[in-house]
UniProtKB/Swiss-Prot annotation:
Protein name: Histidinol-phosphate aminotransferase
Higher taxonomy: Bacteria, Pseudomonadati, Chlorobiota, Chlorobiia, Chlorobiales
Positions of transmembrane segments: none
GO molecular function ontology, one term from the record: histidinol-phosphate transaminase activity
Family: Belongs to the class-II pyridoxal-phosphate-dependent aminotransferase family. Histidinol-phosphate aminotransferase subfamily.
Cofactor: pyridoxal 5'-phosphate
UniProt cross-references to Pfam families, sorted A to Z: Aminotran_1_2 (PF00155)
Keyword match Cell membrane: no
Residue numbers bearing the N6-(pyridoxal phosphate)lysine modification: K218
Protein source organism: Chlorobaculum parvum (strain DSM 263 / NCIMB 8327) (Chlorobium vibrioforme subsp. thiosulfatophilum)
Subunit note: Homodimer.
Catalysed reactions, as listed in the record: L-histidinol phosphate + 2-oxoglutarate = 3-(imidazol-4-yl)-2-oxopropyl phosphate + L-glutamate
Top EC class for this record: transferase
Length: 355
């Protein structure tokens, strides 16, 4: 008699679940996935598509998207061999984790953090060392360093600015961790364009154990294009490239990236709008009874309410979709809402006042 197919699978699958988005992905006012509220203008889309039409669709793209990598390297002011492009930063996370994590390897993750970190560590049979954030959801840098040294961790993942908590480490704090800890450090800078803190990309040549992760899904408004990057020194890059899926990024992504970077004022204008709205929303939310708002360094806000499940449902019924993040450590009865257009934010405020 044959074994049940489950007995033939990776046993780690019993400890993880498929990714899902509570409430779906469609709503009149969609504020649940930290996307930009601004799509690319039609004139730029037309220009991108005109270029893509001239590409051969019957041929594979490059093994790695070398033209996109060179474009982004030039934008950052780093050598092309220090950059690798992926089909979204999630794919890059899979690649980096496969290169850095294995059975028995210790992975330090401040909690709460992006849920995919834990999932990948478990899937690759790593041992997670959790370090809680402070009660105000800021990083406890001393605790991170102490745990890394005590547990002799191999890999440290820092979401800074943090998703879902919304706060950042300073440039000096990240450098302190990288310089002190005997581990590879991944700094996930998905929200860096919204942050008051400086990127640590400038440290990649100084520290051979640092990797920086970037996404084009947030500030650059390209979530539908799936474009991510890792930046590190060439020696480490040669190693993390080994498990990378070949042909994963097509020419459309490369062409889109080049055109958006050539018209970067679209990004800076959108970021200024979002930051101004974030400041207004912080003030407005602070005036609503029963709502506690946390300081943010991203394009989203964390609020604590009396009953997150009930408020989430009432907002959903009112046409506004946010993210219930109550399941994360330290975030009981918390909701996450990204900054939308003025009218979308006003709709959220109106509903919260009636909850």
């Amino acid at each position: 008699m044959k074994r049940d197919f489950r007995a033939l699978l990776n046993p780690a699958l019993e400890r993880i679940e498929a990714y899902k988005v509570e409430g779906g992905q469609d709503a009149e006012v969609k504020l649940n996935q930290n996307e930009s509220p601004f799509d690319l203008p039609m004139w730029l889309k037309d220009k991108i598509l005109d270029e893509f039409r001239r590409e051969p669709w019957n041929r594979y793209p490059d093994i790695l998207p070398y033209r996109g990598m060179a474009t982004y390297a030039s934008f950052l002011g780093v050598p092309a061999e220090s950059v690798i492009m992926s089909n979204g930063s999630n794919e890059m996370l899979y690649t980096i984790f496969m290169a850095c994590v294995g059975a028995g390897r210790k992975v330090l993750i401040p909690e709460p953090s992006f849920s995919l970190y834990d999932k990948l560590a478990v899937l690759l049979q790593g041992e997670i060392v959790s370090v809680p954030l402070n009660p105000d959801l800021s990083f406890d840098v001393d605790a991170i360093i102490a745990a890394a040294e005590r547990e002799k961790v191999d890999f440290i993942v820092l979401s800074t600015p943090n998703n879902p908590a919304g706060k950042s480490m300073s440039h000096d704090e990240v450098e302190r961790i990288v310089s002190t800890c005997d581990a590879i450090v991944l700094a996930d800078e998905a929200y860096i364009e919204f942050s008051q803190q400086e990127s640590v990309v400038d440290l990649i040549d100084r520290y051979p154990n640092l990797i920086v992760l970037r996404t084009m899904s947030k500030a650059l408004a390209l979530a539908g294009m799936r474009i991510g990057f890792a930046i590190t020194n060439p020696e480490l890059m040669a190693e993390i490239t080994k498990p990378k899926i070949p042909f994963a990024s097509g020419r459309l992504a490369e062409i889109t990236l080049a055109n958006v970077l050539e018209n970067y004022s679209l990004v800076t204008d959108a970021v200024h709008y979002i930051l101004a709205e974030r400041q207004r929303m912080e003030q407005e939310l602070a005036g609503i009874a029963g709502v506690e708002v946390f300081e943010s360094d991203t394009n989203f806000l964390i609020i604590r309410v009396g009953n997150a499940k009930e408020v989430f449902t009432k907002l959903r019924e009112g046409g506004v979709l946010v993210r219930n993040v109550s399941g994360y450590p330290l975030m009981q009865n918390c909701l996450r809402c990204n900054i939308g257009l003025i009218e979308e934010n006003d709709r959220l405020l109106e509903l919260l006042k009636s909850c």
